[in-house]
């Protein structure tokens, strides 16, 4: 039986890491194999981000932006980390997104984990520089923090000051793993949410990724403060950090991929599967997360000059057989067609993948040497 073509609003990836797009191109396994989440960070992702340079980041950004559009994702809310290439890194991401016609909300995730307070200051300075100078109509900037357990109270407080100075919000990892909670308690706080609130680091409208280890009472506090949460079910399952079972109490929860490909229908399916055993989640929880992501994107682009808002972004699926996955045929962002007949309008996917393979082969030796 044939399914007719259909039109849906563009998808929003509410939390991702564009810099990870080269990982499928032969990233070597961690050695020795990690046994917990912090070891996954230390042996995989923190080594990868330290190995990034301008060329590898550009190849990653161009590929991720292009492939996202082919999945029907029209807005990326990204969290960048590249300690060896901080200054100018957000321009690399922004240029790639503007090139292919995808919306993006960008930040650099400031952290003290490698170079102490000076590293944190440089990350915040990159956010400030980018927000002040960005003129791209499809790109907005916010302030970023990695996760509170990698930051001093001074860096957290300074990040909040920068956000208020620039009249913007924060994008931060929140209670992804128990390590974040335990670190906050060792510092005298009830948890990472309370720590960030105490250091005045979360302006209303801020985006907190994960929230796996928040209690329902904490999620209610977050909602009352006007804070967004971005749930990342595939990543949380893959990293074995648990299911974010308390997020059901908030109406401000969107769906992200945490660096996985921006295939939001696949993320939707993962959330449906993982939430099936929850006594609290409503049957339409996954669908509501997708809708909420569009509300979040509209909030971040409200009043942006030079382009129509994300509310009009559209994806058209081609007609096809019921037993076959739906195929994206056409994608429109800000009134411009960026995918037509299933192909990029502004680039060649195979050329982008070839460049990604080339840069990946240079990246892995740098990563192994760290």
Regions found by a protein language model. Name each.
Residues 1-8, 132-134:
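Histidine-rich, glycine-flanked metal-binding segment
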Residues 15, 72, 97, 143, ...:
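Divalent metal-coordination and catalytic microenvironments
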Residues 21-57, 114-115, 120, 174, ...:
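Active-site gating loops and adjacent loop-to-helix segments of metal-dependent hydrolytic enzymes
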Residues 199-323:
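Active-site-adjacent C-terminal substructures of enzyme catalytic domains
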């Amino acid at each position: 039986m044939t399914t007719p073509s259909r039109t849906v609003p563009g998808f929003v990836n509410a939390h991702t890491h564009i810099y990870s797009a080269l990982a499928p191109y032969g990233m070597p396994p961690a050695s020795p194999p990690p046994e917990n989440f912090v070891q996954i960070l230390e042996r995989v992702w923190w080594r990868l981000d330290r190995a990034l340079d301008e060329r590898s980041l550009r190849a990653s950004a161009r590929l991720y932006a292009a492939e996202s559009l082919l999945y029907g994702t029209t807005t990326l809310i990204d969290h960048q980390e590249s300690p060896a290439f901080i200054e100018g890194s957000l321009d690399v991401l922004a240029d790639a997104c503007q090139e292919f016609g995808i919306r993006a909300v960008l930040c650099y995730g400031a952290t003290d984990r490698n170079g102490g307070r000076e590293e944190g200051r440089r990350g915040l300075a990159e956010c400030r520089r980018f927000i002040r100078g960005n003129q791209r109509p499809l790109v907005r900037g916010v302030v970023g923090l990695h996760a509170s357990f990698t930051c001093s109270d001074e860096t957290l407080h300074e990040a909040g000051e920068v956000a208020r100075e620039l009249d913007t919000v924060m994008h931060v990892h929140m209670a992804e793993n128990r390590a974040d909670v335990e670190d906050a308690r060792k510092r005298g706080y009830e948890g990472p949410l309370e720590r960030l609130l105490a250091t005045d680091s979360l302006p209303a409208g801020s985006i907190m990724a994960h929230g796996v280890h928040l209690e329902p009472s904490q999620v209610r506090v977050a909602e009352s403060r006007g804070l967004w949460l971005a749930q990342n079910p595939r990543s949380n399952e893959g990293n074995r950090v648990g299911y974010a079972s308390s997020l059901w109490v908030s109406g401000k929860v969107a769906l992200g991929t945490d660096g996985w490909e921006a295939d939001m229908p696949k993320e939707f399916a993962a959330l449906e599967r993982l939430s099936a055993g929850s006594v609290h989640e409503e049957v339409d929880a996954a669908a509501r997360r997708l809708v909420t992501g569009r509300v979040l994107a509209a909030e971040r682009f409200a009043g942006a000059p030079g382009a129509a808002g994300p509310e009009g972004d559209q994806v058209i699926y081609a007609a096809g057989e019921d037993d076959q996955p739906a195929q994206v045929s056409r994608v429109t962002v800000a009134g411009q067609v960026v995918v037509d007949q299933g192909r990029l309008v502004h680039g060649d996917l195979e050329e982008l993948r070839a460049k990604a393979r080339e840069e990946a082969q240079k990246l892995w030796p740098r990563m192994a040497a760290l």
